[in-house]
């Protein structure tokens, strides 16, 4: 089998059929869709079974709730395809997404293929998310030169990490070779950790530039539009994972990126929570770690520069006022 597409499913009733419809419309052949029901308490398990009954291309895995990492790992364990793709169950793949990515992977013998994607707002407005990288094949020397500088986090904190699993295709042989899987105790944004580790080990990487083959929807309640309780502690734990993995690499210095990664998620938590006590908690952690003592501020938008300046000078009350206070949640 050429391809396994892994779709974690949890509380996505309004979007699940739309997502699976886009996967059943793929122009490639010889592929399977793995719907991993992560103990969803709504009608999603029933919808998964109904969809699977209509085609041999779909397999359903029902499991106890363990989080997004656990669901993706269950899919990885069950996958039969030579290549692995990941699709979030509230998103939509273009009909030719995986045919194009598979062709690129096979002809270039790439470990990872990445495409650009569309970010889609609730209003329906969308725009293409691309990078400064050139299109085409990168071998190891080029990966180190061009991908490593933003592998964990680039200088522009107005954007997130370079790689995410849902717009990449992976060779299963490559993933198995380096024992790459998701950290079960990181319940969200775990693909940042997985993607950075995969990108580090890749020997051949192919970039499909300006081809928006994936539609990433910013739906209400997602991690991009809200912060679950305990978010800051999870992001700190993820950063420690990255530090343990990347701090002592002899082929590249990732220290600056590790700082930027933590700062990016500190900014995210502050913007989403907007409550003075919660903001003070984040700022206290950064200052106790002497984060800003010798930190060179990145080149970002004026709005973010103001937020970073206020964070550096521990202006929690001003941040709360500017962002608009919301109810506090536990960290």
Language-model region placement:
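Cell-envelope/extracellular polymer assembly enzymes that use nucleotide-activated donors
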Residues: 1-4, 32, 193
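Short, well-formed alpha-helical segments that are part of the catalytic scaffolds
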Residues: 11-25
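Acidic helix N-cap motif at the loop->helix transition within catalytic regions
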Residues: 15-17, 42-51, 92, 96
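A conserved acidic beta->alpha catalytic loop
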Residues: 22, 29, 37-47, 64, ...
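Glycine-rich, basic loop-to-helix element that forms the pyrophosphate-binding segment
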Residues: 63-79, 89-92
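Donor-binding/catalytic cores of nucleotide-activated saccharide
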Residues: 68, 92-209, 214-230
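Short aromatic/hydrophobic "clamp" motif used to bind/position activated sugar donors
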Residues: 84
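Membrane-interface aromatic/basic loop that binds lipid-linked glycans or pyrophosphate carriers
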Residues: 272-331
